[in-house]
UniProtKB/Swiss-Prot annotation:
It is a multi-pass membrane protein. This is Melatonin receptor type 1B. Belongs to the G-protein coupled receptor 1 family. PROSITE patterns: G_PROTEIN_RECEP_F1_1, G_PROTEIN_RECEP_F1_2. Residues 24-41, 103-126, 201-213 are extracellular. The lineage of its organism: Eukaryota, Metazoa, Chordata, Craniata, Vertebrata.
Length: 289
């Protein structure tokens, strides 16, 4: 399961390394100055990040659903080899979903948001396909998975104490809650832009002029800001991530002390802190009351 979280983090990180700095440069120069190639590449990378994020969030929801609701089959379905295969498939599908931008000419500079991005009016059919693939289908799948998990959680809480009846471990519930919040924040940040895109695609000539510029700008920057939120959510809801964040900050503030502690930990034996995992597949998935 952690492989999907790392993959999601990669999708969030890639926009911070390339497209976002170019957006800042465009704001500074009040226009795009880097040429068409950088424009198309940055728009393509942005698309990879966006679609890769929702595909990974969907994969995490399915993973949590199998882990909690079908625990007996989990280890077989999500073996190490299968998990790597699933992650690879996610990124292959992400590339397949993003490449058509080059053929429909939908990657252009938009001065309202100072970035090269997907133009919703370039192709109505492709815009509808993007909204369906990027938003509607994933939201439906993730909603089903988390609804089933919530039903199980409620059923477990209502059970009478018994040595034979399983219950969820608190750590499993916290991990599920963390990823559920990630999903809710994603849906909240991306819903306005997708609904605008769908409305414009259905009737471009009538709907495009009716969309207020302020609403379009706010919806775009809400979507952009989503990539920055996941790390904050992990830190707020997961103790292991908070510990690792503290270690990173300590290493930046007092690197000498940090490396001394690291060296000391290595000589004291196998006492290193656990990685900031969101789940632990080596533990039993059920427990008794």
């Amino acid at each position: 399961g952690n492989a999907f979280v790392v993959s999601l983090a990669l999708a969030d990180l890639v926009v911070a390394l390339y497209p976002y700095p170019l957006v800042l440069l465009a704001i500074f120069h009040n226009g795009w100055t880097l040429g068409e190639m950088h424009c198309k590449v940055s728009g393509f990378v942005m698309g990879l990040s966006v679609i890769g994020s929702i595909f990974n969030i969907t994969a995490i929801a399915i993973n949590r659903y199998c882990y909690i609701c079908h625990s007996f089959a989990y280890d077989k379905v999500y073996s190490c080899w299968n998990t790597m295969l699933y992650v690879s498939l996610i990124w292959v599908l992400t590339v397949i979903a993003t490449v058509p931008n080059f053929f429909v000419g939908s990657l252009k500079y938009d001065p309202r948001i100072y970035s090269c991005t997907f133009v919703q009016t370039a192709s109505s059919y492709y815009t509808i396909a993007v909204v369906v693939i990027h938003f509607i289908v994933p939201i439906t799948v993730v909603s089903f998975c988390y609804l089933r998990i919530w039903v199980l959680v409620l059923q477990v809480r209502r059970r009478v104490k018994s040595e034979t009846k399983p219950r969820l471990k608190p750590s499993d519930f916290r991990n599920f809650l963390t990823m559920f919040v990630v999903f809710v924040i994603f849906a909240f940040c991306w819903a306005p832009l997708n609904f605008i895109g769908l409305a414009v695609a259905i009737n471009p000539s009538e709907m495009a002029p009716k969309v207020p510029e302020w609403l379009f700008i706010i919806s775009y920057f809400m979507a952009y800001f989503n990539s920055c939120l996941n790390a904050i959510i992990y830190g707020l809801l997961n103790q292991n991530f908070r510990n690792e964040y503290k270690r990173i900050l300590m290493s930046l503030w007092m690197p000498r002390l940090f490396f001394q502690d690291t060296s000391k930990g290595g000589t004291d034996g196998q006492k290193s802190k656990p990685s900031p995992a969101l789940n632990n597949n080596d533990q039993m998935k059920t427990d008794t009351l």
